[in-house]
């Protein structure tokens, strides 16, 4: 099964489970969790079921295309369901079966790995899913997002697209993966991987990046004062990516690193609070009424 077919199979499966299929969000981010389709939608009582593939940029992980499985940019297939279904783990195993992986014939383990994203004020109960000794998925029940307690609980399934495809295609090197017939992962991404690694470690203008971080931080705060959650959150994401670029260049000390993460976290918490208040003011319109009573 090539990578393109694998993604389409996951999309079809989760669509059948009631998830809407979205396109990736168009601002740089380090993980699919940071998309507003997860971060914001996990806040408050309104139900939400969605799936999307998310390119995730992690500058410090770039290896110029020379490492078989560490990348400046990788892909995640993200599934979020709120409230979390009681049978979410069974649904996940069903998705593997659709990919031709019979749980009865493979060693599939849920290894406890509670999750935290300090820069966004997020935390949850979590497990890594290991398939025959290889981690392929992160499974999380959100307890806190943007410093706010999550109720109802949102379940998040994050498939590592390249890792899962490497297992299915029995490839040792991600660049040897078949994206679709006659086209390899290398054909599409190798040059970008090499050049982005060069940028992240060698040529980025750190003075400019330091200025950009401050500028993005101010703009995020200004948009929140206007009550504009989504523009503000875009600039929080830009702060996060800019910090990651600075971190990759090694220009941020240990003390400064904690300070930068704290600044991003403060912005994320303000966004979360503002978003909750804006939805509350609207009466949480996506909450369904059953028998004349609100179902929360």
UniProtKB/Swiss-Prot annotation:
Highest taxon listed in the record's lineage: Bacteria
Gene Ontology cellular component terms for the protein in this record: cytosol
Transmembrane regions: none
Root EC class: ligase
EC number: 6.1.1.14
Keyword Nucleotide-binding: yes
Record text on subunit structure and interactions: Tetramer of two alpha and two beta subunits.
Family stated for the protein in its record: Belongs to the class-II aminoacyl-tRNA synthetase family.
HAMAP family for this protein: Gly_tRNA_synth_alpha
Record-given protein name: Glycine--tRNA ligase alpha subunit
Organism: Listeria welshimeri serovar 6b (strain ATCC 35897 / DSM 20650 / CCUG 15529 / CIP 8149 / NCTC 11857 / SLCC 5334 / V8)
């Amino acid at each position: 099964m090539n990578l393109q077919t694998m993604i389409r199979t996951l999309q079809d499966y989760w669509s059948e489970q009631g998830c809407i299929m979205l396109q990736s969000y168009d601002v740089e981010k380090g993980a699919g969790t940071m998309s507003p389709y997860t971060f914001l939608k996990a806040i408050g009582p309104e139900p939400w079921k969605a799936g999307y593939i998310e390119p995730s940029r992690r500058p410090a992980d770039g290896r110029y295309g020379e490492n078989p499985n560490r990348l400046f940019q990788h892909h995640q297939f993200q599934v979020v369901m709120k409230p979390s279904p009681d049978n979410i783990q069974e649904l996940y195993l069903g998705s593997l079966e659709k990919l031709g992986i019979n749980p009865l014939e493979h060693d599939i383990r849920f290894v406890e790995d509670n999750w935290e994203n300090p820069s966004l004020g997020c935390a949850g109960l979590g497990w890594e899913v290991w398939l025959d000794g290889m981690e392929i998925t992160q499974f999380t029940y959100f307890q806190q997002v943007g410093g706010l307690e999550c109720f109802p609980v949102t379940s998040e399934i994050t498939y590592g697209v390249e890792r899962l495809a490497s297992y299915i295609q029995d490839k040792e090197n991600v660049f040897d993966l078949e994206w679709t017939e006659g086209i390899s992962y290398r054909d599409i991404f190798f040059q970008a991987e090499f050049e982005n690694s060069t940028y992240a470690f060698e040529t980025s203008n750190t003075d400019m990046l330091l200025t950009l971080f401050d500028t993005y931080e101010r703009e995020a705060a200004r948009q929140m004062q206007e009550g504009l959650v989504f523009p503000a959150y875009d600039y929080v994401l830009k702060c996060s990516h800019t910090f990651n670029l600075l971190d990759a260049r090694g220009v941020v000390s240990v003390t400064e690193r904690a300070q930068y993460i704290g600044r991003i976290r403060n912005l994320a918490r303000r966004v979360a609070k503002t978003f909750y208040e804006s939805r509350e003011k609207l009466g949480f319109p996506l909450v369904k009424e059953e028998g004349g009573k609100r179902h929360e």
